[in-house]
């Protein structure tokens, strides 16, 4: 599987991954700033935070809500990037017969299959984790300057990173479609649907109860794993 991941990295290139990451951060920041400017004018920031944060100063509330929305849009963008990577790596490999070339390596069909998925997770996940860690680190530092104790600490960051990992795994649902339907439209539409479902679940559970997001992630993860098993069975029977 390492060979497939190395070949996938060479096929995409570090420059393309870096450009995806920078575009994702810039887009998420712009959208978040626009949304929060309206919420701040209407003084509705506290409604998007737990009740314990209602007594915090307005600038700290702004920072917390900005962080929550920024990470939310970063996750959504990562789901879309996973869809593009799936199309670029898997569908392009089918069309250009790269799978036939890769199959000449001492690899089983199963190793080839999971090697492609591992490459997608790594290429989409590493930039997200790095960006997420930097954003959370800056937020924690900023909050320690303005408030003590900080509402978000190491435990909060660990939970956010765990949630990110589940988002990445669920994002494979759009990648699985690339093994069934070799068209960009199917892959991207499925990624957009995942974005809508998970973003709505995230915003809703911020207001009500955080357990709802875990329930949605668990259901989607189960569906993803079933699809992975089905597409693996389908892939092993294909003529490369």
Where are these regions (language model features)?
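Hydrophobic alpha-helical transmembrane segments
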Residues: 1-81, 85, 93, 179-180, ...
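Hydrophobic alpha-helical elements at and bordering transmembrane segments
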Residues: 5, 9, 112-113, 157
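Membrane-helix interface segments
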Residues: 17, 108-114, 182-188
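Residue-level recognition of transmembrane alpha-helices
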Residues: 22, 116-117, 160, 164, ...
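Secretory targeting signals
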Residues: 27-89, 114-185
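Helix-loop-helix units of permease transmembrane domains in multi-pass membrane transporters
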Residues: 88-121
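Membrane-water interface segments at transmembrane-helix boundaries in multipass membrane proteins
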Residues: 154-159, 203-215
């Amino acid at each position: 599987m390492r060979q497939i991941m190395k070949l996938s990295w060479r096929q995409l290139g570090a420059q393309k991954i870096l450009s995806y990451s920078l575009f994702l951060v810039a887009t998420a920041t712009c959208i978040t700033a626009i949304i929060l400017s309206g919420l701040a004018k209407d003084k509705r920031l506290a409604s998007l935070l737990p009740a314990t944060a209602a007594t915090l100063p307005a600038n700290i509330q702004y920072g917390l809500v900005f962080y929550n929305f920024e990470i939310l849009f970063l996750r959504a963008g990562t789901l879309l990037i996973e869809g593009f990577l799936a199309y670029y790596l898997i569908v392009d490999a089918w069309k250009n017969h790269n799978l036939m070339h890769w199959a000449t390596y001492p690899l089983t069909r199963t190793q080839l299959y999971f090697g492609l998925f591992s490459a997608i997770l790594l290429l989409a996940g590493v930039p997200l984790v790095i960006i997420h860690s930097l954003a959370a680190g800056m937020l924690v530092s900023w909050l320690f300057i303005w408030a003590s104790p900080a509402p978000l600490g190491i435990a909060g960051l660990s939970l956010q990173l765990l949630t990110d990992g589940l988002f990445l795994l669920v994002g494979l649902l759009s990648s699985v479609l690339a093994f069934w339907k070799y068209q960009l439209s199917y892959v991207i539409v499925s990624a957009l649907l995942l974005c809508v479902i998970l973003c709505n679940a995230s915003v809703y559970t911020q207001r009500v109860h955080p357990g709802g997001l875990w329930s949605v992630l668990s259901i989607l993860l189960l569906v993803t794993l079933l699809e992975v098993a089905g597409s693996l069975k389908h892939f092993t029977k294909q003529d490369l």
